[in-house]
Amino acid sequence: MFDLYSGTGTIAQLMAPVAKKVIGVEIVEEAVVAARENAAHNGLTQCEFIAGDVLKVIDDIKDKPDIIILDPPRDGIHPKALPKILSYGVDHIVYISCKASSLARDLVTIQDMGYSVEKACCVDMFPMTGNVETVVLLSHKKPDGHINVKVEFG
């Protein structure tokens, strides 16, 4: 499992008990240090945290995830990073967004790459403000196993 833009690793650590391995990637080094300390404190040996930009680090990760969790900054995912992330072809992606316009922009690319929105939910993490977190579950469309072809002869 990948937790990209993992911050201090909260989501990775919540998912660790049901995953063989969770790899978190975060650009803020102090957050990665905290994530490693938190995982060690909680005895979560299956968590690995990497400090670096997702755009660059993703090329160096040899593991293949079975699910990807995305929690990017307000500006969303770098346009060059998104195709790299989607190239893993995982069955499910969970995208957590704090800015609806960035989410909408990224969803166009994600859907063009064969994913569909299964569920979406807004979570009011900031009461009395206009800001909400949006959580979206995306599933990769699978071919139905056959192709219908209509041929007309004139």
Stretches with model-predicted labels:
Residues 1-154:
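Rossmann-like S-adenosyl-L-methionine
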